Design a protein with these regions (language model features):
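Short acidic, glycine/serine/threonine-rich helix-capping segments at coil-helix boundaries
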Residues: 1-62
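Active-site-adjacent loop/helix surface patches within enzyme catalytic domains
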Residues: 92-239, 243
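Catalytic phosphate/metal-binding cores of nucleic-acid and nucleotide-processing enzymes, i.e., regions
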Residues: 89
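Beta-sheet entry/capping signal
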Residues: 21, 122, 148, 264-265
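Catalytic-site microenvironment of enzymes
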Residues: 2, 9-10, 42, 67, ...
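Basic/polar, cationic surfaces and motifs that engage anionic cell-wall
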Residues: 62, 70-84, 191-294
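Structured segments of extracytoplasmic/periplasmic soluble domains
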Residues: 35-46, 58-65, 139, 184-187, ...
Length: 294
């Protein structure tokens, strides 16, 4: 593959520039390819010299950490989420839906289902490798992707589209069967200072994470308030959509039932494919057990 051609096409599609890797550089040449490799090695990525989706997400997080961040103080929250236009109560005090004036605007690809309720079999949990939910939605829009929910650093749940809409977040044939959430977490411990500087505090670290049979280097965990928000979202989707309070039988790897789309319940992205590691360290069964005990 011509890497220069690939990078130029990627830049036009996603909106990045050669100068983001080399100040003042404008060419999509071998020098840029080398600079992308250096960036990829520094971020634990496959160093192929091509700025694909994974490299782009890390690039955005790197650039965003140097920008001034203003935490939006909202005073008007919803007490429900929406499925086929109908409100579903949720036991959480910070919810902003796609119908609210202060919604995060998602423009990525999605499919609107009309005339009937689609059957949602399972709920897919992601981390976004972004510094905040606004940045996550920006990346999704540039990549022409979508998801039903985001959970921000302070626990705010954003609904980005109706749960009856098919969003593009889990890959191909999984999307019509599920809804999903992107939980804000830049993943790499190098971003801890950004969180502390902007008033969120230091993130917990996962130091014993494993996925697909391999041990992981220490990475940042979700804040406790994000896990509480996730629990509230799981519970609302269980009650409103009838998704069973079940976790995959395979705890830290691809689950055969999830992969074959016969599973019904709550799972992580890595349960679908070996190509994903999110959300390693998230004990879904423990969250579901708390809901059962409520």
């Amino acid at each position: 593959m011509d890497k220069g051609f690939y990078n130029e096409a990627s830049a036009h599609r996603l909106g990045w520039e050669a100068s983001w890797f080399i100040p003042g550089h404008t060419e999509y040449d071998a020098k840029l390819t080398k600079a992308i490799r250096v960036f990829q090695r520094a971020h634990g990525l496959s160093a192929d010299g091509m700025c694909g989706p994974s490299t782009y997400r890390r690039l955005i997080a790197d650039r965003d950490q140097h920008k001034e961040y203003t935490c939006f103080e909202n005073k008007d929250y919803s007490d429900c989420i929406y499925y086929a236009g109908q409100p579903i109560p949720i036991e959480w005090d910070k919810v902003i839906t796609h119908l609210d004036d202060n919604a995060l605007k998602m423009t990525g690809k999605k499919k609107t289902v009309t005339g009937k309720k689609r059957k949602v079999k399972y709920f897919v949990t992601h981390w976004d490798v972004c510094l905040n939910s606004e940045s996550c939605v920006r990346v999704l829009n540039r990549r022409n992707l979508s998801v039903q929910f985001c959970i921000d650093n302070d626990g705010t749940i954003y609904q980005l589209c109706d749960m009856n809409d098919i969003a593009y977040h889990a890959g191909g044939s999984h999307n019509p069967n599920c809804v999903g959430v992107e939980i804000s977490n830049a993943y790499y411990p190098k971003y801890q200072n950004w969180y502390k500087r902007n008033g969120f505090g230091e993130r917990p670290l996962v130091t014993d994470g494993t996925v697909h049979g391999s041990s992981m280097e220490p990475f940042m965990d979700f804040y406790p308030v994000q896990k509480e928000a996730l629990k509230a979202l799981y519970k609302a989707c269980h009650i409103g959509l009838g998704i069973p309070l079940e976790a995959p039988k395979t705890k830290w790897g691809v689950d055969p039932e999830v992969r074959k789309k016969t599973f019904r319940g709550f799972c992580s992205h890595f349960h679908l494919t070996r190509g994903k590691i999110d959300c390693a360290g998230l004990d879904i069964e423990a969250i579901l057990e708390q809901i059962r005990e409520d």
